[in-house]
Amino acid sequence: MQLFFHYNRIMNQKDILIYPTYFPSISHYIAMIDAKTVTFEVEDTFQKQTNRNRMYIYSPNGIQLLNISVKHDSANTNFKDIKIDNQHNWQKNHFKSLEAAYKNSPFYEYFIDDLRPLFEKKHEFMLDLNFEVFELVNDALGISIPFEKTTEYFHEVSNKTDFRYLVNGKKDATQIEPYTQVFDDKHGFINNLSILDLLFNEGRYAVDYLKQHSL
């Protein structure tokens, strides 16, 4: 049975198109870890109120949005040209929020020192930050996800499964199996947060958890 499941999973693997985001949602990682190939969309125009520059965590008061302010000259600015507004001390605020949310989680101390340097340096471009985040999370999970980048933008694609919609949390209806969260005794299980929530609570068991899901 296990061999059949493994074979069936390989046969169903997809070539996917997806956005690089800031500490991606769990659904993002379900899509990527289950993919045959991953291509990141980098030729799009920037859109506000998406996960390109935000993540959601589980704070003592429930769900919390962590947003990075960005600078853009027009509504048609390419995302790869979007600069971070470093006048706002987002690094300090985000790190303190992560500490308040996860310092009592099982794996916070194990991973936080590897993540800390990210919040101690200033990045110029949002896209560069997102790719550094991607590599950091992969290292923490103990996985490697090879990827390519787009060279031009297409509104519709026929040769890949288009998961770009996942960048918009309002359009992402993914439901995942509950796992233990720090404050679930107060607020219950909160679905599909940042991959950091799964990492701090499940450690490298998170990889097995992700592989139990598919989109």
Q: Predicted regions span which residues?
A:
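Residues lining hydrophobic/aromatic ligand-binding pockets adjacent to catalytic sites
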Residues: 2-215
